[in-house]
């Protein structure tokens, strides 16, 4: 009948249109030529032949400090002018190689060098600029991040108001110490680690937080960050046993949290051993990312002994711990 015929013709038109969109590179090229703004990943732009004949007036690359040199060059060669946006004091490029293959270690180390950092350190004058106002964090948290990681510049905190949470029991920055708790040491699991005492302390804090928020009928986003996959799995398992109506919780590793933000961040250190071995937690950039995700409240859970002597040249937890005990107005050590 006429109705079926109409729907069939409509279907044929849509099918032809879809085929043109998915298969006709010339059709894609015409659309792209008329576009003022195109979004892509660094490597994704090389996946389409239509970009081979296009030169952009501007190429803006976000999170440029995390990209390897080859990844950055893919979009950079397609632009007349380049803007790189990033933070070389946060996570570096990540390259996956077989750690046991000695022949690849030199290549791996080379690829993990940040072109963004190299350019930042070598370029002078008006060719680079530093953003000096942060709009994410409460001023107490922002001041700490500025002092610990960006002391060479004065970063202004925005006037945006951030409310206080659990202000009688906690400060905007709190460290819950597990050193005096039984069984506070880490447990190895394959190549990863977990810490049951830190998981217990985290659940206790979430209970307190949810109870406090329920009194005011307010919901908050919570990010729980761990440097180790075994701890992430443990935390995920423990959190799933509870139902907190006023908490929207995300649990992930440090790498997954870069670029994200939550009202409250809980950072689970995990490492706690007699040798005071920090593993890759000794990388200050990873700690910077973890601590700077918080908007209103930052809670660190772990053994304060990590802030003492370690067999490494650098221990980023030492100056963090010293800042906390030196600023009782904004910070609190809970033992």
Model features per residue range: what roles?
Residues 1-58:
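Conserved helicase NTPase catalytic core signature
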């Amino acid at each position: 009948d006429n109705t079926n015929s109409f729907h069939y013709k409509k279907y044929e038109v849509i099918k032809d249109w879809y085929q043109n969109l998915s298969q006709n590179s010339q059709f894609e090229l015409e659309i792209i030529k008329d576009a003022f703004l195109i979004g892509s990943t660094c490597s994704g732009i090389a996946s389409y032949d239509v970009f081979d004949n296009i030169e952009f007036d501007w190429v803006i690359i976000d999170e440029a400090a995390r990209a390897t040199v080859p990844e950055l060059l893919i979009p950079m060669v397609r632009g007349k002018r380049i803007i790189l946006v990033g933070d070389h004091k946060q996570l570096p490029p990540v390259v996956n190689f077989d750690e046991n293959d000695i022949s690849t270690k030199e290549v791996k180390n080379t690829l993990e060098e940040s072109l963004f950092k190299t350019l930042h350190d070598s370029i002078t004058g008006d060719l680079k600029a530093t953003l000096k106002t942060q709009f994410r964090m409460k001023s107490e948290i922002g001041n700490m991040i500025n002092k610990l990681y960006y002391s060479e510049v004065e970063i202004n905190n925005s006037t945006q108001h951030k409310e206080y949470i659990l202000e009688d029991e906690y400060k905007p920055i709190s460290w819950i110490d597990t050193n005096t708790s039984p069984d506070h040491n880490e447990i190895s699991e394959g190549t990863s680690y977990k810490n049951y005492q830190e998981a217990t302390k985290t659940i206790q804090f979430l209970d307190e937080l949810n109870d406090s928020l329920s009194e005011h009928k307010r919901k908050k986003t919570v990010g729980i960050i761990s440097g180790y996959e075994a701890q992430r799995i443990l935390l995920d398992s423990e959190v799933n046993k509870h139902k907190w109506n006023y908490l929207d919780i995300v649990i992930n590793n440090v790498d997954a949290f870069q670029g994200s933000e939550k009202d409250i961040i809980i950072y689970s250190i995990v490492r706690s051993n007699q040798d005071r071995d920090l593993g890759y937690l000794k990388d200050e950039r990873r700690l910077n990312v973890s601590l700077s995700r918080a908007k209103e409240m930052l809670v660190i859970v772990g053994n304060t002994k990590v802030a003492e002597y370690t067999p490494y040249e650098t221990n980023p937890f030492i100056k963090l711990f010293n800042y906390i005990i030196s600023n009782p107005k904004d910070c609190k050590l809970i033992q």
